[in-house]
Design a protein with these regions (language model features):
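Conserved Class I SAM-dependent methyltransferase catalytic core
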Residues: 1-46, 50-55
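S-adenosyl-L-methionine-dependent DNA methyltransferase catalytic core
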Residues: 23-27, 35, 45-229
Length: 229
């Protein structure tokens, strides 16, 4: 599985993606690709990324469907109840941003995003987190920065994920990360497709399946049935 920005398919008039796909196919992979949005998989972040999946076996694979809106986490769900004052911006910054806010009556909570032109737009979700882009300066309610835990939650990390580095590194790590629920959903469909392929006798020549090869190379335990339900 590979992940990249959604514009990969348009880069160099589509030639970059074409070369990647053709190279994977020459290596023997059956390739599937689709742009998925993290918003559709349960996190309050508009993060559109192309996911490229390859199989050495000719399996019948489909990308996962978006989850129901009722099951998606909202911004309210991921915000911490108590936040240290160090995350709050100076009054001058807050007042300046509110003055430039396009919709001054936008309901809270919201995340505002300052683009390259200095325009500030509120949304009920985060834009795609970035590793170090000052042009994507996000604030919650134009009052404070997201905490480390909130940044991780925006990417779908569980709360038992330990924070052992300072804020700047968490910001960089979450900006470089994939959205966990998206990758989990795709991986679940990959496992289901491979399982179905082999249950229907797709591997009749006696060779090891991709699942078996993965488990052997990683010394992994057999994949439990609940992973493909």
């Amino acid at each position: 599985m590979l992940e990249n920005v959604r514009n990969l398919t348009a880069h160099d008039n589509g030639n970059t993606f074409k070369i990647i796909k053709e190279h994977l196919e020459r290596l023997g992979y059956h390739v599937y690709a689709k742009v998925l949005n993290a918003l559709d998989f349960g996190v309050p972040q508009k993060r559109e990324r192309i996911i490229i999946v390859g199989f050495l076996e000719d399996v019948d694979f489909s990308f996962p469907d978006p989850i129901p809106e009722s099951e998606r986490k909202t911004l309210s769900d991921i915000l911490e109840d108590t936040v240290d004052k160090k995350y709050y911006v100076r009054d001058a910054i807050r007042e300046s941003r509110i003055e430039r806010l396009k919709d001054k009556n936008y309901p809270k909570p919201y995340i505002s995003h300052e683009n390259m032109a200095g325009s500030i737009t509120p949304h009920p979700y985060s834009s795609a987190l970035r590793a170090g882009a000052s042009a994507n300066y996000i604030l919650i309610n134009d009052e404070r920065r997201p905490t480390e835990r909130e940044l991780l939650r925006i990417q779908g990390f569980p709360d038992d994920y330990k924070i052992v580095v300072p804020y700047g590194k968490i910001k960089k790590q979450t900006g470089n990360s994939v959205a966990v629920p998206v990758i989990k959903a795709v991986a679940r469909e990959m496992i289901a497709a491979l399982k179905k392929f082999h249950e229907h006798g797709g591997n009749e020549n006696g060779e090891s399946s991709e699942i078996e090869r993965f488990q052997t190379s990683h010394n992994a335990d057999p994949i439990p049935a609940k992973c493909v339900s």
